[in-house]
């Protein structure tokens, strides 16, 4: 798509989204576009500190979980001692960025609004770790907490997965992995998916949208994919292109959230239409005027807070 033919996204977004885009952090250096991936990860962590401020206080615990690849860091957010379920959260960041700190506020608000224990899993990033290592470590962490539930005083009888962007793909892929391989980690009662990618290679929204403002040009998306996957054949794996998995049976109830000006929006629409066509429990909600990654900005955006509340309400309705 010739850039001039794309939608003028920054003219079309909502007033509160524009406020976020125009919010400057004077002490923050420029984005290291030509820097190393380590420098970009460091910048991302610094940039998110402002947006994570003011999150609810609650009991938190950290555990290192053993996997066949080594140990993975996890963080538990416990809003109350008698949690009705446990929700595993997987952060976004194109598979190459992000950690438990960059998504701290999101996890705290989810825990507060759902009154469920939320466990963030700091899965290994790409390109150091290639598909399907992240999924395997997520599943290993779920199994570990299922086995240690009594010792850690968490309720693993009912669980869920949640994630944003790349984390949304990992959330649904992990749920399908557990189903397909018949691994019992507790009953999966819900999956919360904010503006994920689920396997489309091209779409209308991928053509019309995406730019320097969201880091989701076609070239960006190709770079994330190449960093994450081990080889070309992985593109068709049912745990990367989730539309190649069986979405006609035993898919946990899915809350699918879309951002209006997100190039990945058609992934969410197709996922919803596929699940709904096969009578799989699902709900789709579009958040007008928003860009990809808007969930981070609940400190300033009522719509972001609403999207988190909607996801939490969907999850608790399944209990």
Swiss-Prot record:
Q: Does the keyword Metal-binding apply?
A: no
Task: Give the residue ranges of motif Involved in the stabilization of the negatively charged intermediate by the formation of the oxyanion hole.
Answer: 91-93
Q: Which GO terms describe its molecular function?
A: carboxylic ester hydrolase activity
Q: Known SUPFAM superfamilies for this protein?
A: alpha/beta-Hydrolases
The UniProt keywords, alphabetically, are: Cytoplasm, Hydrolase, Serine esterase
Looking at the UniProt record for this protein, which Gene Ontology cellular component terms does it annotate, in alphabetical order?
Answer: cytoplasm
Q: Hydrolase: present as a keyword of the record?
A: yes
Q: Which Gene3D superfamilies match?
A: alpha/beta hydrolase
Question: What is this protein's function?
Answer: Displays esterase activity towards short chain fatty esters (acyl chain length of up to 8 carbons). Able to hydrolyze triacetylglycerol (triacetin) and tributyrylglycerol (tributyrin), but not trioleylglycerol (triolein) or cholesterol oleate. Negatively regulates MalT activity by antagonizing maltotriose binding. Inhibits MelA galactosidase activity.
Name it: Acetyl esterase
Record organism: Shigella boydii serotype 4 (strain Sb227)
Gene it is expressed from: aes
């Amino acid at each position: 798509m010739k850039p001039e033919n794309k939608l003028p996204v920054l003219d079309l977004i909502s007033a509160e989204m524009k406020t976020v885009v125009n919010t400057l952090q004077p002490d923050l250096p420029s984005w290291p576009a030509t820097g190393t991936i380590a420098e970009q990860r460091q910048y991302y962590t610094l940039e998110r500190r402002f947006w994570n401020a003011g999150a609810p206080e609650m009991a938190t615990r950290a555990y290192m979980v053993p996997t066949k690849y080594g140990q993975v860091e996890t963080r538990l957010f416990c809003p109350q001692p008698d949690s009705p379920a446990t929700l595993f959260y997987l952060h976004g960041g194109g598979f190459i960025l992000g950690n438990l700190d960059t998504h701290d506020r999101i996890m705290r608000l989810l825990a507060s609004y759902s009154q469920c224990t939320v466990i963030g899993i700091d899965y290994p990033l790409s390109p150091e770790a290639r598909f399907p290592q992240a999924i395997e470590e997520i599943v290993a962490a779920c199994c570990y907490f299922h086995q240690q539930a009594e010792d850690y005083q968490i309720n693993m009888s009912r669980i869920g997965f949640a994630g944003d962007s790349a984390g949304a793909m990992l959330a649904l892929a992990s749920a399908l992995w557990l189903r397909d391989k018949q691994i019992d980690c507790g009953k999966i009662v819900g999956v919360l998916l904010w503006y994920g990618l689920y396997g489309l290679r091209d779409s209308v929204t991928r053509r019309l949208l995406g730019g320097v403002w969201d880091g989701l040009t076609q070239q960006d998306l190709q770079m994330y994919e190449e960093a994450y996957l081990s080889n070309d054949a992985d593109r068709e794996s049912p745990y990367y292109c989730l539309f190649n998995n069986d979405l006609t049976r035993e898919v946990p109830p899915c809350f699918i959230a879309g951002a209006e000006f997100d190039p990945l929006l058609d992934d969410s629409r197709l996922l919803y239409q596929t699940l709904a066509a096969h009578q799989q429990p699902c709900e789709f909600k579009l958040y007008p005027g928003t860009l990809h990654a808007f969930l981070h900005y609940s400190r300033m955006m009522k719509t972001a807070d609403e999207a988190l509340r909607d996801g939490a309400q969907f999850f608790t309705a399944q209990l």
